[in-house]
Amino acid sequence: MNVLVIGKSPETLEKVKAGLRAKGIVAHGTTEIEKASVNFDAKDFALVAFGGGVPIPVCEKLKSEFRQQNPDVILLDTFAPIAVQHIAAALRGDLDKREFGSRFEVTRHEGSYIVRLDVMKEGDVRVEAYHLGDRLHAETILEQHIPSGPFEARIHESKIHRGLNMILVTLGGSEFYFHRIERN
């Protein structure tokens, strides 16, 4: 299957493409974000992945243009630390087969970001905060085994920096939930 990865950083893009190729996935990529739907046709791809550094308005415009080119193409928001696993799971159809969690949301409340998730099956959870500054910074907020039922984690606002941030929740080592926060 052919995949197109759209990202901001040439180095990161090459690492993601190499990881996909190691899994037997034909991977193409571009850092010419604004021209992606002109330079590539979604009919040539099973999946188009958008990296976390792609600005939201540009991402939405590209998704619309790619959807017009190929209504069946999978359009996936992802980011570097999980991109290879995330893309491979999407190609297998695993993203629709959530085994561990459902209803994921992140809200802001009294100086913190609250992560809420309905856990359907007990397992391990890891909550991480990523920040893209001069390089990608990661901090594990919480890592533990949890029972089924409602799950909540609090991320203090001091962990969220100026610029692009991602909150990543991994359930059972294989299900990914993430939320993008851009702070000025």
Regions from the language model: what does each represent?
Residues 1-10, 48:
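Conserved acidic segment of CheY-like receiver
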Residues 25-32:
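Short hydrophobic/Thr-rich beta-strand motif most characteristic of the beta2 strand and flanking loop
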Residues 155, 161-175:
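Short, aromatic- and glycine-rich surface loops/edge beta-strands on solvent-exposed regions
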Residues 35-37:
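Short alpha-helical segment
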Residues 50-65:
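Conserved phosphotransfer microenvironments
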Residues 65-101:
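Ser/Thr/Gly-rich flexible loops in soluble cytosolic domains mediating phosphotransfer, phosphorylation
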Residues 132-151:
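Solvent-exposed serine/threonine-rich low-complexity stretches and specific carbohydrate-binding patches
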Residues 111-122, 129:
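Aromatic/hydrophobic beta-strand junction motif of beta-rich domains
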